[in-house]
Amino acid sequence: MSFIEKVRKLRGAAATMPRRLAIAAVGASLLSGVAVAAGGSPVAGAFSKPGLPVEYLEVPSPSMGRNIKVQFQGGGPHAVYLLDGLRAQDDYNGWDINTPAFEEFYQSGLSVIMPVGGQSSFYSNWYQPSSGNGQNYTYKWETFLTQEMPLWMQSNKQVSPAGNAAVGLSMSGGSALILAAYYPQQFPYAASLSGFLNPSEGWWPTLIGLAMNDSGGYNANSMWGPSTDPAWKRNDPMVQIPRLVANNTRIWVYCGNGTPSDLGGDNVPAKFLEGLTLRTNEQFQNNYAAAGGRNGVFNFPANGTHSWPYWNQQLMAMKPDMQQVLLSGNTTAAPAQPAQPAQPAQPAQPAT
């Protein structure tokens, strides 16, 4: 059955569902199609020229009880953390598979860090191993990215644990902003590209849960509990705008409108999902301005679909801005203590 036929079949079934659930179901189906359309062959340095000083590191994560693969290109004491999408692979980071990011940042004065893995994780600290797919450990990506890996990188690769940038796309767009909200010294710069910036709102928890289940059988209840759990708002960039404003974080927010340009992405899922995501990005800009935010770049062009060429274009567009912020020496954000993830009164129960 073709993708379009699947969508038509789902739309027919959705006609009997409540409206919010129907939208979520169709959206989740389209989201899974985007992942396929935006995929690529897992080849090292896929679109970067050969001979670059890219290293493949094994960084210990005591919180997850395993080593995490990290692709790394040294370039200076400050680094760009490039976070992957929903279907992150266990062999290479999507930025390496689908873009020439290593080549683009070679001799830029910035190191490049690409953590590998984390499918459907939202780079968050989960409550428990995912129920239903046999996961035998608990995702603790926030701990890894903000404590374990920075200390290891400082000791072994001379990368500072402060004054870095977090750049995320799709699933990880909001994650980048959340990392900056709670860890302002580490991330004075954060960028979201086509990110889901209000995950606790309305039908978004349902949509996210369906998409996670489709991508590896992951259970959103195991991540942040039911949609009423405070962890959803704790990890919601829209809710955490006051932190970003108080920190004076330099933010870069991009979302297309679902119309393809000469960069490509002219397929139903890529167009639909970008259009679906745009509303919350525009609302984020409005709320940010209303909260007194004055340190953001917002790009909502008259084109752009949910696909890698547009995200790479934005990465290159923000590069000079990122260099100016991170290499100027003025990377000290407002002092703030990292807030701990909300804890439930008792372990969240698996969804039924």
Curated annotation (Swiss-Prot):
InterPro entries: AB_hydrolase_fold, Esterase-like, Mycobacterial_A85_antigen. One of its GO terms (molecular function) is diacylglycerol O-acyltransferase activity. Belongs to the mycobacterial A85 antigen family. This is Diacylglycerol acyltransferase/mycolyltransferase Ag85C. Coiled coil: none annotated. It is found in: Secreted. It comes from Mycobacterium avium. The active site is at S170, E274, H306. Residues 102-112 are annotated as: Fibronectin-binding. GO terms for cellular component: extracellular region. Its main location: secreted. The antigen 85 proteins (FbpA, FbpB, FbpC) are responsible for the high affinity of mycobacteria to fibronectin, a large adhesive glycoprotein, which facilitates the attachment of M.tuberculosis to murine alveolar macrophages (AMs). They also help to maintain the integrity of the cell wall by catalyzing the transfer of mycolic acids to cell wall arabinogalactan and through the synthesis of alpha,alpha-trehalose dimycolate (TDM, cord factor). Residues 333-352 have a biased composition (Low complexity). It is an enzyme of class 2 (transferase). Keywords: Acyltransferase, Secreted, Signal, Transferase. Homodimer. Residues 332-352 are annotated as: Disordered. Substrate binds at L86, R87, S170, N198, L276, T277, L278, R279, H306, S307, W308. Residues 1-37 form the signal peptide. The gene is fbpC. It catalyses: an acyl-CoA + a 1,2-diacyl-sn-glycerol = a triacyl-sn-glycerol + CoA; 2 alpha,alpha'-trehalose 6-mycolate = alpha,alpha'-trehalose 6,6'-bismycolate + alpha,alpha-trehalose. Its EC number is 2.3.1.122, 2.3.1.20.
